[in-house]
């Protein structure tokens, strides 16, 4: 069965989220910092009266050399709105869900629940992230320090 995904980039990684959850994409939205919030939460974004956490995807996935300041992907995940802060936006791609390669079983912590798998593309891998897991982790952060979170693993092609 084909399903559409919004493709985006964080550092050197190509990631995707289900297009049906997409509300809009914006450039350079500012958010209000919240004292004491974890590093992955950039702050609270007010988009036309809708308040939502602004999640720094580079910090969330521990991807170095990425500022995630260029684009905000606004999503409706179940009953919650979230904003993913990313480096750049790609296309919306229709992919066959049967071609999804499951992630390695040795992933742990938030990566085990966040990475749903990957699609093989001609240009490399598209890593599919679970937006429901990101939303849960953003709203019920377990207090992980940056040092306790492993970096995003390299999936072999």
Give a label for each model feature.
Residues 1-157:
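An acidic, low-aromatic, low-complexity terminal/linker signal
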